[in-house]
Amino acid sequence: MIQVTSPEYNFSKHGDIAFVPTMGNLHEGHLNLIKAAKLESCFVIVSIFINPLQFNNANDLINYPKSIEADIKLLEAAGCDLAFIPEETILNDIDSIQASEQSNVLCGKSRPGHFDGVLTIVNRLFTIIDPKIAFFGLKDYQQFILIKNYATQHFPNLLIKGVPTTRDISGLALSSRNNLLNPHELDLAANIFKELCLIKTNFSLNKIDLLASEAKKNLEKLGFDIDYLDYLDGLSLKKINSSTSIIICLLYTSPSPRDRG
């Protein structure tokens, strides 16, 4: 596997590129993105860069899990062709991107500027690497929609593909931030998926308000601080109607408030 740190590297010499951007601390969810990329008969590039522009809290940035040596071994085992691990100088003279109004709901309500930071670094990575296809996990659904729509406007030849969320045996979505939870908190966090599944199983438009309210109450009884539990149109991220494709999203703080899910 090739390892590159310089943005000046000639990525285009490798032909069609399938790109997986990450912030490192890789897990099975990231590896599934790489598996999807390898199915495309392209040269697979994975970037590792902890982007300070998307953190609202300095402590979150400092405490974000880092495991670069282990990450490199995982990338090699997964068949990644090139690891792009830039220094923070990649941010020099960067064009700041303002996210669309779709960033004002869900996570964006409590994390102002977060998605601006995401799109700013993604725009630079796309410009540097010029991939044919880029892969993102659907766990961060709002981020996926924002990036997909941004790419449609500014990188029309780039295909953005979403990969389903990878979960552990309890149903908990795999996340680098899960490393900040102790075993008891991990067990409690499994209740998130259970409540979302109950909403899905019993869903109807005239019951959704009640189902969401009950799920929120159940989780709060366990000690969760629910930032939002919302249901929106899956494409526009606007309020639902009778013909909409619905996405149900939830953001919480664990009973020990050290992690945002």
Predicted regions and their residues:
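Long, charged alpha-helical interface segments
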Residues: F193-K194, D227, I247-L251
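Conserved small/polar residues in nucleotide/adenosyl-binding loops
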Residues: Y252-G261
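Nucleotidyltransferase catalytic core that binds NTPs
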Residues: I2-F224, Y231-S236
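A short, glycine/Asx- and small/polar-enriched loop/turn
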Residues: I240-I246
